[in-house]
């Protein structure tokens, strides 16, 4: 049976993937398995998935959702932005923090309920600081090294990441693009049925043949 290694985004939980009703493992983002069937990464998890693949992780397929290719300009500005959020995740009032986080334009008004008790706030702040896109090296120049099939997904209302997705599939040797019409950044949870169907279709189309018939 196909096993999906699913990497959630920032402020994500392993249970975020329960809706898929597929054989899914959702590891800690610091302990990504080095091999498997399909590697699925959303947002921050998508960036970490790309770096894992470029670092030699062995998977048959990959699905990247709402992920960027890295910050090539204005890195100091992005670092300052991430530090601002890190300070708030460490010390800010939770309700106001969640309201402001979900009000960011990329989310298109879609909010995911999050309870403070589910998180270590110092760990969230550390993730923002250590995994800032301004610190991780940009990957565009190395995407040609990822030879496995890749499905890259973005929501049509998430203009920045649609542009990143289109650029990525031009650079990858074996990639498909799905723009989820009407969705913003959180495609899997805005359109769970369509997302799960597209994921199943991609995996099924890439399964190695098990036929023993003679040619």
How would you describe each model-predicted region?
Residues 41-45, 49:
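Gly/Ala-rich beta-loop-alpha elbow adjacent to hydrolase catalytic centers
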Residues 159-165:
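Conserved alpha/beta-hydrolase "acid-adjacent" motif
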Residues 170-186:
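Catalytic histidine neighborhood in serine/cysteine hydrolases
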Residues 146, 152-154:
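Short beta-strand/loop motif that positions the catalytic acidic residue
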Residues 51-54, 58-90:
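Flexible "cap/lid" loop of the alpha/beta hydrolase fold
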Residues 73-77, 88-142:
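Conserved alpha/beta-hydrolase catalytic His-Asp/Glu region
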